[in-house]
Structures are given as structure tokens and as C-alpha cells.
Amino acid sequence: MDVHLGNWRLCGRRCGRLAHVVLPEAFLDRHGLAEDAGAEFFVQTRFTGSLRPSSYVRVIGAFFGGGSGDEIARRDRRSALNLVLSLPLLADGDGRYDPHNIATLKVRSGDGRRLVFVDFFYLSLLGAQMPRGPESEGEGGKDGGAGRGDGEASRESPLERIAAEASGPGPGSGRGRSAGGRRASPLSVLSGLLDNKYTQIAKHHRALEDPGAVRGVNIEPDRRDHGNLAGVGKRKVRCALNLIDLKRDDITFTSSTHLLSGTRFTLCHYPRPVAPPGGAPWESTLDGLSERQLRGVDPLAALILGFDFLERAQTGLVNSLARECENGGLKIFQRLPVCVEKKHDIRGVLGDHFTEACHVLARQVGESCAWVRACVSGERGHVGLWADFLNLWEAGPSTLGVDLSYLFSPGPPDDESAFWARLLGSDRLLDAIKTGARAVLVVDSQLAAWLLLPGGFAIKGRYSLSREDIQITVGRYG
């Protein structure tokens, strides 16, 4: 895979290992990843003991068609969509890996408007880094005779045995190996068994003319005056690059399971040069721990840390909305002139919508929420507006992190009345608050939030984040 080789050259020295993966079409559909020629790919590590992740590392990724799963090397390239890339893995100071760390893949769309995050546990990525050892199987079967003399873990195919018998013993030749010491491919084996069909002819003979002499052409050297070399350009020297051809190596494809979604993907293991020398197995941070210490290890620690962080932010917003209602004497005001169907008990209807919206907001824990996008953009000096469109009473999935920053063009509103006037420019927002069982949360880059209920009634809240919380948000989701 050229993409895997490119990642090895790009970031191979910046990490302990690289997990080379191929994500099939079913995996892409499950995580909402569509083919995008301009997409950009970044990877970071989220640790089990800290909310602060590693810096994002940009990696090379490419979409291509052609099979999925273990048959990736055999299927037609036009049959299915796949994404191939590499995930850098980080070791601790002792060169060991925590299998419960998470490698987070961030995919940014070509237009920059959409971000998708996919989490991989190290445990599911390090499997291909441990190639199987050589089996001591001789002529008499398993443990029935002498093993391979060179101690290699390779397996002979019938074609390689035929090639070895046809070529016979010779210097540098081995069972199933070419003269260069590499495993013979089926094509090379079959080609080597074919007889030469062309007629042997002599290319030189004393009765023939010198091949370098052509009649009618002056072959005398051009005698020029080399005294003045000022106008002579520098000689261009061309040299061939020592490029590595991955086709020369045995590539092992291993199927692995994405532990969070249950979908399958493929791990590619290269003996060299994209893998550590000799394919040495990795060492775990759990090695050497006592049974008592292992009982205290939480395999979901890295995942729970991030979830709790996002949940605290959402809970803080819900509490601020509740305090605003209490401080205002449970009064709510219509901010947008939207006509709705008249009810006998409009206060009770709005109260039910507010209560349900707060419950839904408390459960909306994810990196795609409007407040996350607003926090990242505000920290980078951008002024904008984002919205979460909420479906209440389980009417359907909510749509999170919709960018409404175009409403602030060419600049932010001067006062609150201008702000509400700008919101009238969003047809999608108006459609959401014209009917029941829906609500909209609007968040600006200063983390001020407004919960819009049917009829244009609004309640203002706020995300109260410390400076450290903002830095963590930008580091993880920026």
C-alpha cells in the first residue's frame, strides 16, 4: 500500500508504531464517513489517566474501491469503497503500550464544514503488530520432524515447492525462495517453468560491422574551444531514488473488530520497512502487574473520562437554564414573531417542552454538539453561531452542530434585537419552532446559549467553562 508507506515516511519517527488499517464500506457507513477526495485525516491519542490528549498528527488517507475484509487483495477494485490510512500509536517512557488508550481518528471534510471522530482502542490495533512465531513442523507433520533450518516463520505453498524442485540446488537458492532470498510469487514461479520459445541468434560476429559505426555519420569528436566556460550551464546529474517496493514483502491481512461499534476492519502487517525491525511484539503496561493491581484497572477509563467531561458541560447548561427560569419568576418571553396553533393552556405546553428539552440536552453528550464547535471557533478568534436541532419525546434523532455563522455575515449583531432579527434569516430554524415536539439550542462563540421553544419563546443560559476546560476542548475536538 503506497498510502501506508507514505505514512511511515511522514510520521514513522514521531510515534512508537503505526497501525496500518483498511476500513471497509460497512465500517464507513456505520460511522457516517462518505467518500471525499478532499478529506483530511488527523490522529491523536487519548490516555486513560488524563483528559489532555496528544497533539493531532496529520496522516495520509485515501478512498479506493475494491473489496473489504480479508479478501481485500483478491477482489475487483471497483466492487466496494474502502478507506486506507495509518494510525500512529504512542508508547510510554519505558517503550510500553497501554492497550486501553484510544487512538482517535478525526476526518475533516473537503469544505471544512464537517468533522467526524472515530475512536479505536489500542487493544484492537496492536494485534497485527505481533506476527506468529515459527512453527516447528517437519516432514512428519506437527512436531514430527526437523523444522526449518533458517528458523523463518514463512509458509511454503505448493507452487514454491514445485519451483524448488524444478530449479534444483544452487548457490543462494532455498526452498520457495528466489535468488535474492525473497519468497517467489505464483507469477514468477509459473513464468520460471516456461521454456524459451524465441530462436537464439548471434548479436555479434566478426563479419558484421562495429555496432557503434554508422555509415554516413561523422563520429569524430566535436572540437570546441573550452577556454570560455562562463556561458556553460551546470551539468545536471540524475540519480535514481532508492524507493522501497512493498510488493516484495509478505503483507499479512488480519481482521479486527471495532470494539465500540462491532464493525470489522482490516489490519495490514508489513514485515519491513513499515513495521519495527523484526516485527518485535509490543510490551503492555499491564505486564508485571499483580492480580490485585489488575482488579483496579478500568479498560474504559479513557472513554469514560471524555464522556464525563462532555456530560459536565451539558449539565452545567441545563442548570443555568433552570436558574434563569427561577430568577425570572417562571416567566418566558417570545423573542421571534412566529405564529403557532393556539392552545388553551399555552403555559403548560411550553412547560412540558422546556422540561423535555432539558432532559434531551442532558443526554446529548458528543463531540459534534454546537457548544463544542462554538468553543473551538471562539478560541481561534472566529465569530459565529451554531445550533442543535432537538427532537423531543423520541420523535427522531437530533441534528447537532449545524453551522449558522452565515447569519453573522459581514459581522456580529450590535445588540440583542439585531441578534433576533438575524435569526429570522434561517428558514431551517423557523421551521423547527413552528411545530411541536421540537426545540433548538443556539450557541455563539462566547458560549452564550438560547433554548428556543415552539412559538419563538426563548430562555437564555450559558456554558460555564474554565480556562483549562476550554484548552481541553480545543485539544480534543479542535
Swiss-Prot record:
Residues 149-163 have a biased composition (Basic and acidic residues). The keyword Glycoprotein does not apply. InterPro entries: UL17-like (IPR007640). GO terms for biological process: chromosome organization. One of its GO terms (cellular component) is viral capsid. Its main location: virion. Residues 131-184 are annotated as: Disordered. It is found in: Virion; Host nucleus. Keywords: Capsid protein, Host nucleus, Late protein, Viral genome packaging, Viral release from host cell, Virion. Residues 169-179 have a biased composition (Gly residues). Capsid vertex-specific component that plays a role during viral DNA encapsidation, assuring correct genome cleavage and presumably stabilizing capsids that contain full-length viral genomes. Belongs to the herpesviridae CVC1 protein family. Interacts (via C-terminus) with capsid vertex component 2/CVC2. This is Capsid vertex component 1. The gene is CVC1.
